[in-house]
Structure formats: C-alpha cells, structure tokens
Amino acid sequence: MSYYQHPSAIVDDGAQIGSDSRVWHFVHICAGARIGAGVSLGQNVFVGNKVVIGDRCKIQNNVSVYDNVTLEEGVFCGPSMVFTNVYNPRSLIERKDQYRNTLVKKGATLGANCTIVCGVTIGEYAFVGAGAVINKNVPSYALMVGVPARQIGWMSEFGEQLQLNEQGEAVCSHSGARYVLNGKILSKVDV
C-alpha cells in the first residue's frame, strides 16, 4: 500500500487509490472509486462507487462524494460541502437510474458548506464561496456566492480576486499572471 490509511477508515476491495494519498479517520471508500495520487480525504469523508477524484485533490471533513461526481486535478472541497446526485429525490420513489453527472474541473475551489446540485459543470479554477448553492454551470475562473449562487467576479489560478480594467484585462497581484475577458469567457494569457 503506497498511501496512508487511518485504522478507522474503510476501503472496500477494488477501490483504486494513488500513491502518497492520505485517508483519514472514519473515511469510507466504495469498491468502484478511482482516486488519484497525492489526494487528502479528511475525517468522515464518503466516496461512492462511480466517483473519480483526480491527483492532488483535497477533500475536507464531512464531505460525501456521491456516484457520478468527477473531480479533476487539484480540486478543493471545503468542510461539510454537499454534492447531490438526484435532482428531485423522494424517499418512496427509486431514482438510482436518474443520477446526473457532475464535473468539477481542474483547480476549482468549493467553499465550506456550499451545495452543488447535480448535473452541472464547474469550470477550471472557479471559486464557489462558503454556503453558496450552485444549480447551473459555472464558467472557468468565476467567483460565485449566494443562494442561488450568482457570479460577482473573477478569480486567478492563485486564488485571488481579479480587478479587471476597462479593456477587460487583469494581472494577479501575487503571481503576475495575466488574464483577459472576451465576452463572458476569462482566459489566462500565456506570456
């Protein structure tokens, strides 16, 4: 085993876990899960069967990653944030054949206690604020807050809010990376 597993964690036979990952207290990983290298799963995390977690993701305490969720590389899931997998659940109606796919792209941050309603895509390096409810697709680099969430700005890959000038350009104050807004799409400019 090339990853750390706390003695209280349960990893079902068949689960794939990459090297240098850390599986902490009371985690349960189901048999069909695929987890990349260098991943950290905090206390009381649940990972379903049809879940893919990319390299270097960090999932904080009390998060359940249900079936049909894919997290690309470097995604941060804050404490007690929530994924759903059925849009209109009912206790007395079986809807396991109606799970909707949720994709969280590279480098995105999902803040503490936010809710991601199933069937959405969250773009690269997007930033979902604490407690926000996401019920539609989120553009790359977008800063989303509120219930339901609305976009209030743009974030750099470094995780700093960008201040766009009149030409729709910005420079990250920490990394020096440049960004340009074309219509409703923000892109990082390679220098």
Swiss-Prot record:
The UniProt entry, under InterPro entries, shows: Hexapep, Trans_hexapeptide_repeat, Trimer_LpxA-like_sf
Q: Which GO terms describe its molecular function?
A: acetyltransferase activity; acyltransferase activity
Q: Which enzyme class?
A: transferase
Outcome of gene disruption: Cells lacking this gene are incapable of producing either long-chain B-band O antigen (> or = 2 repeating units) or semi-rough LPS (lipid A-core + one O antigen repeat).
Q: Which UniProt keywords apply?
A: Acyltransferase, Cell wall biogenesis/degradation, Lipopolysaccharide biosynthesis, Repeat, Transferase
Enzyme Commission code(s) on record: 2.3.1.201
Give the Pfam families listed for this entry. Answer: Hexapep (PF00132)
Q: In which pathway does it act?
A: Bacterial outer membrane biogenesis; LPS O-antigen biosynthesis
- Please name the Gene3D superfamilies in this protein's record: 2.20.70.110, Hexapeptide repeat proteins
Superkingdom of source: Bacteria
Query: A biological process (GO) annotation for this entry?
Result: polysaccharide biosynthetic process
Family the entry assigns: Belongs to the transferase hexapeptide repeat family.
Q: How does it assemble?
A: Homotrimer.
* Protein purpose: Plays a role in the biosynthesis of B-band O antigen for serotype O5.
Q: What is this protein called?
A: UDP-2-acetamido-3-amino-2,3-dideoxy-D-glucuronate N-acetyltransferase
